[in-house]
Design a protein with these regions (language model features):
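Active-site segment of SDR-like NAD(P)-dependent oxidoreductases
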Residues: 79-81, 118-126, 174-177
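Glycine-rich phosphate-binding loop and adjoining beta1-alpha1-beta2 segment
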Residues: 29-59
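N-terminal Rossmann NAD(P)H-binding glycine-rich loop of SDR-like oxidoreductase domains
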Residues: 2-24
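Residues at the starts of beta-strands that form the adenosine-phosphate
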Residues: 1, 25-27, 111, 167
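NAD(P)H-binding glycine-rich loop region in Rossmannoid oxidoreductase-like domains
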Residues: 49, 58-93
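SDR active-site strand-loop-helix element
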Residues: 5, 30, 73-77, 112-118, ...
Length: 185
């Protein structure tokens, strides 16, 4: 079973659709149906027609028995609002939740692909390199970018300690827009 967090959101729902196109339906889909500032009707529309084995609210995941049976993690879930100012909310959703998933990937020896953000680069004054020594030089311009940067830095700390899943990938998304985001157009 493949875990997809943020499965009702823009990127997560398109990922699940692509997995479905590949014939993969044994998916544990996780999201916040009533996430702060999001219209539930939009997520319901994004989920329409998708095939998955089980849906869980984000806070239910860690106590569900299926969590111990997953074979891969696509972590696309987060508070993605660049205008969010609630630092505790961002820490809980974008850093701490991600750390638990990362540790689970290591424990189960499964791959993890997670959504980072170009917001981690800040103004771009330091460039856009993902060389490990450069990442610590970046200064995000908003709390959202800072939360994503903090998780990236934590991952690098785990790498230095040799405490990572065998395969893990952080994807830096740049100002994404497309199908399932029409409400923002």
């Amino acid at each position: 079973m493949i875990l997809v967090t943020g499965g009702g959101g823009f990127i997560g729902s398109l990922l699940v659709a692509e997995l479905n196109d590949l014939g993969i339906t044994d998916i544990l889909l996780v999201d916040h149906k009533n996430q702060k500032g999001q219209d539930q009707a939009i997520k319901d529309k994004n989920l329409a027609g998708l095939k998955f084995s089980k849906y869980l609210e984000a806070e239910e995941l860690f106590t569900d028995p299926e969590f111990k049976k997953i074979s891969a993690i696509y972590h696309m879930g987060a508070c993605s609002s660049t205008t969010e100012r609630d630092l505790e909310y961002l820490k809980e959703n974008n850093i701490e939740y991600s750390k638990i998933l990362f540790k689970q990937a290591k424990e189960l020896n499964i791959p993890m692909i997670y959504a980072s953000s170009a917001a981690t680069y800040g103004s771009g004054e330091q460039g856009y390199s993902d060389e490990h020594q450069k990442i610590a030089q970046y200064s995000a311009l908003n709390p959202y970018g800072d939360s994503k940067l903090k998780f990236d830095l934590w991952v690098l700390e785990q790498l230095a300690l040799g405490d990572t899943p065998e395969h893990f990938y952080g994807i830096k998304f740049f100002n994404v827009y497309g199908p399932n985001e029409y409400h923002k157009g």
